[in-house]
Amino acid sequence: MRLVPILAPRGFMDQIASENVIAFPAWARRAAYQFALGLPLDAKGFVTSGDGPRYSGSGNTISAAGTTSLIPPTHEITHTGEVITIDGVRLEFQLTPGTEAPAEMNIFLPDLQTLCLAENAGGTLHNLLPLRGAEVRDAKAWAEYLTESLRLYGSRTEYLVTQHYWPRWAMTASWTMFPRNVTRTNTFTTRPSG
């Protein structure tokens, strides 16, 4: 039997412990409001939280039927530029700590000209101040990591995938808009009000 590698960014297990175990009771209460867990899953109740439809397991739940657990990573990604090949597919990693999550990373598949920006650049502005009470994200660092993504992978990327959003094609022609959006995100989320 062959083991499947489970990859995670540096610091992932520490962040899982601090964010999900220690803060979970407060998070669970706030998440019930943030994700409208008390509403029925129908046209007059809950439809979407912006990420997409909610799974319907048994009753009004946010996960499919079954159990949830954590399998610890078998390999920790320690630096940007680290390359690993799994089943003949090369994966190049960019660490992006403190962005959408305290331990986060993007993945570039050079042979497929595909960049996965994780949850760092979805179709919506993602969780700078999570309502459930998670750590406030650093908008400036987030914008800098997106700019680094553009510098590292922009000229080599034809396909862009993110979580919670449609894939995008013909990206080499679309990157001209990207820096403007990153700057706008940084400016609008960090300047003082008033």
Language-model regions: role of each:
Residues M1, L7-R10, T96, C116-A118, ...:
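Active-site neighborhood of phospho(di)ester-bond hydrolases with catalytic His/Asp-centered motifs
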Residues M1-P73, I77-H79:
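Active-site HxH/HxHxD metal-binding segment of metal-dependent hydrolases
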Residues R2-I16, N106, T183-S193:
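Acidic, His- and aromatic-enriched active-site or binding-groove loops in soluble protein domains
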Residues R2-V4, N20-W27, L131-G133, S174-T183:
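Short secondary-structure boundary/capping segments
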Residues L7-G11, Y33-L37, K44, N120, ...:
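Short, surface-exposed, polar/charged, turn-prone segments marking secondary-structure boundaries
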Residues S18, S56-N127, R132-K140:
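Catalytic core of the metallo-beta-lactamase
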Residues T114-L115, T124, K140-G194:
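Divalent-metal (often Zn2+) His-rich catalytic cores of metallo-beta-lactamase-fold enzymes
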